[in-house]
Amino acid sequence: MGTVKLGIKNNIVLFSLLIIINLFVGFMVGLERAILPIIGEEHFGLTSVSAALSFIISFGFSKAIVNYFAGQIADKIGRKRVLLIGWGIGLFVPILVIIAHAWWVIVFANVLLGINQGLTWSMTLNMKIDLAKSNQRGFAVGLNEFAGYVGVALMAVISGYIASTYSLRPEPFYMGIVIVLIGFLLSLFVKDTNKHLQIEAQKKKNSDVISSREVFKRTTWTDKNLSSISFAGLSTNLKDGMSWGLFPFFFISAGLTFNQIGVIVAIYPAAWGFFQLFTGALSDRIGRKWLIASGMWVQAFSLWWILFVDIYALWIVGALMLGIGTAMVYPTFAAAISDVAHPEWRASSMGVFRFWRDSGYAFGALLAGVLADMLNISWAIGLVAILPLLAGIMIATRMKETLV
C-alpha cells in the first residue's frame, strides 16, 4: 500500500478538498429550496399543492434510486468516476429551469437534480468514510454534512434575495451553471480512495461475499440495527420533503415576505449543517443509539412548535430546533451504518440506507400534498410530525448500540 494511511490528519488535503466539493453539491439544492414551489404557483399557475410539490417527488425518487445503485457502481468503478458523472448530469439542471416552458420540464430537471445529488453527495460521503479511522467516522460524516447543508442554507438565502430583487426566474439559476462548472473542476483533482478501502478491509475479519439482494434485505428489514436506522432516515427526510414543499406556502399565508421566508428556510439547513460539526464527533464518544432517538423526538416537537406559534422570531426558533434535531441524527445514521457493515459491502449498504432515506423526500412531498389538499397545510405539517416521533420510539426499543 506504500505510504497510504487511514486517518483524517494523514489525508487532510484530500479530505479538505472533498469538504469544499460537498459545499458546492449543497449549493445545487439550496438554489431552488426557497423559490421553486412559488415558481410553480406564480409562473405556471399551479393551484393544487400536490401538483406544486411534484418536483420534490421526482427529485426524491430519482435521488433514492440513484443512491441505491451509486454504492454498487462505486464499489466496481471507483468513487471519483461516479463523482464526475454526477457533476456532468448536474449541468443540465439550471439550464432546463431557465428555459422551461411548462411545469413538466421543471419536474424533469429535478429528476436530473436527484441523480446529480445521489451521485455526488454519496461519493463525497463514502470517500470521507474511506479516509477516516473507525473512531473518526461520526466526525467525518459530520463535516461532510456540515459542508453540504451550509451550502444549502447559503444558496437558499442568496436565491431568495435575488428572487426578491430581480425575479424568481431566470436570474437565480444563472448561478447554477457556475456552481456545476466549479464543482466539476474541483473534482478533477480528487484522488480515488480504493487503496484506503483495501487497508481497512484487511484489518477486518474475513467476511463472506454477500449479494446485492442480501445487502438490501439486511439493511431494509432483517438486521435490526440497519433496518431501524433506515426507517429513521426515511422519517427524517419525509419530514424534510414536507418542509421543503409546504413551508413556503405556510409562511406566505402567514403574511411573510420572500426575504423572511428565505431566512427561515435557510436557518433550518444552516443549523442542520453547523451542529453536525459537533453531533458527529459526539456520537463517536457517547454512542449512536440515544443521539438518534432523541434527535427524532426533537424534530417532531419542532414541527408542532412551528405550527402553534405565530411570531416571526418564534418561527426562527422553531427552524433552529428543527435543524438541531436533524443534525443529531444525520451524521449518526451514516456512522452507525458504517459500524455495522463490512468495508467490502459498506458502500452498497450505505446506498440501500440512502435509498430509503431519500425516498422520504418523495413520500413526504406526496403525503404533504395530499393532506394539504384534503385538509389544509397546518394539518399536513402536524400529521407528518408523527412519523419522526414513531421512528424515535423504534430506535429506542429495537436498535442496539453499534459503537464498540
Task: Kindly label every feature range from the protein language model.
Residues 111-149, 335-336:
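Cytoplasmic helix-loop-helix junction between adjacent transmembrane helices
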Residues 93, 104-112, 302, 313-321:
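Paired small-residue
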Residues 59-68, 152-153, 269-277, 361-362:
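Residue-level signature of mid-helix packing/kink "hotspots" within the transmembrane helices
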Residues 66-78, 163, 276-287, 372-373:
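Helix-to-loop junctions at the C-terminal end of transmembrane segments
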Residues 10-60, 225-228, 232, 236-254:
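Helix-loop boundary and gating motifs at the non-cytosolic
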Residues 171-188, 381-396:
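Symmetry-related core transmembrane helices of the 12-TM Major Facilitator Superfamily/SLC fold
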Residues 81-95, 290-305:
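Structural signature of the two symmetry-related core transmembrane helices
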